A protein has these predicted regions:
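N-terminal maturation segment of proteins
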Residues: 1-411
């Protein structure tokens, strides 16, 4: 960020945005640009230099370079973190067991689809038909997953888009049209797709939704990272996660109800990221109607997230080291070279993967509960409406609100 103090992106991006603003004179634009540059060079850059100096002095003084498990009361803090960030009040053991069961189910679904699909990997790369099991990081016995590398989302074409399509705007329109049957109407809003500046491409995710101000939710922006080369099915489901019916859709729906501002601060990530992941999985069926190849990709995506969530618990609650993670991934057939980056990503953000994956599992469980209670009277659109009307909340509270909305008695 400060390696090129004469050309940091906070200056160049501001200049571009001001130049594009039509309601200012040339002199006014220059004045604003000079004020911004003075603030960046006079305050922001020196502040970063001070931060760097302070952090450098702390290097080597850390008492723990592993998970929360190794801190005093680290396990208790992780339990609290999961309850707060995910909104799941179950014990870690219960959550962990559900993750394992879902991993097995997804793996078996992948096996079944690959065995029946005519355009999958060669026979030599097919997985064994042996039953899969996950009994823990140290004794996991899932068959190898290397066969999944033979399948590319770039070869899965929908009726509306080419397999290498990068038309994000058209995909968002397609998603908004196709979800109308299963999701409620929301106020008309704008959504602009932008691409991040080249100076940020190495530091940001493939895409992100920029949460709008609470008093201006009708103008929305989704940023894409061109460095990720996201296209086809991968781009489509990413846009479902960030846009329709994901973050943008949920955010606009909630804002339109004019909730108390405090609720924006109390929203657990398990609801927001769990919802976005839940509808991302839903969107796979919208791409081509649910072919075997698409279902395999959906299950593979879910399996990958579940694996990361299981490792999150392993690292922070059970105290697994980088060597443990590497051995675990190797046993599953993954390249151990990626273990280090995954380990450090999980280490820096405890319970983060659980927000996505366990949040998604909670929505799937809630949907299943309502379906069982309502039987033939269950309507998916009504369920989604009840979830969105309730807004972000811990799942124990959300279940009560949704049940009340749908007229279901929870024992």
């Amino acid at each position: 960020f400060i390696q090129s103090p004469s050309d940091p992106y906070l200056i160049t991006l501001f200049q571009k945005k001001i130049d594009a603003f039509s309601n200012l004179s040339v002199d006014e634009k220059i004045a604003y640009q000079k004020r911004n540059e003075a603030a960046i060079t006079g305050y922001v850059l020196p502040a970063y230099e001070t931060l760097i100096k302070g952090l450098t002095e702390l290097l080597g003084k850390g008492q723990n370079e592993q998970g929360l498990f190794y801190f005093p009361k680290g396990q208790a803090f992780y339990e609290y973190l999961v309850k707060r960030e995910v909104g799941d009040s179950r014990s870690i053991a219960q959550i962990e067991e559900e993750i394992k069961q879902q991993l097995v189910a997804d793996y078996q679904a992948i096996e079944n689809r690959l065995q029946t699909a005519s355009h999958t990997a060669s026979a030599s790369s097919q997985p064994s038909a042996a039953a899969a099991s996950v009994s823990g990081l140290s004794t996991a016995a899932l068959p190898a997953l290397t066969f999944l590398s033979d399948i590319s989302t770039d070869s899965i074409t929908s009726a509306s888009f080419a397999d290498d399509s990068t038309d994000a705007v058209a995909m968002l329109k397609d998603l908004r049209k196709k979800i109308s049957q299963d999701f409620p109407d929301i106020p008309a809003v704008s959504c602009e797709v932008k691409y991040i500046d080249n100076s940020l491409k190495n530091y940001l995710s493939p895409a992100f939704y920029l949460t709008p101000p609470i008093d201006q939710y009708t103008e929305n922006v989704i940023y894409l990272n061109p460095a990720e080369n996201c296209r086809g099915l991968s781009l489509y489901t990413t846009l479902a996660h960030e846009g329709y019916p994901g973050h943008l859709f949920q955010t606009v729906s909630f804002h339109a109800q004019s909730p108390a501002p405090l609720r924006f601060l109390l929203a657990p990530g398990g609801y927001t990221e769990g919802w976005a992941t839940y509808v991302e999985m839903y969107a796979y069926s919208l791409w081509d109607g649910g072919s075997d190849a698409t279902v395999v990709q959906q299950k593979n995506r879910a399996f990958s997230l579940g694996l990361a969530a299981l490792l999150d618990i392993g690292i922070h609650y059970h105290g697994y080291s980088l060597a443990d993670v590497s051995a675990f991934l190797t046993k599953l057939g993954f390249n151990a070279s990626g273990a280090s980056s995954l380990y450090w990503a999980i280490l820096q953000a405890p319970a983060n993967y659980l927000q996505y994956y366990v949040g998604c599992l909670n929505f799937q469980h809630l949907r299943s509960t309502m379906q069982q209670a309502l039987q033939e009277h269950f309507v998916l659109r009504d369920f989604h409406t009840a979830v969105l009307d309730a807004g972000p909340a811990p799942f124990s509270i959300l279940e009560k609100l949704v049940a009340q909305k749908l007229g279901v008695t929870i024992s």
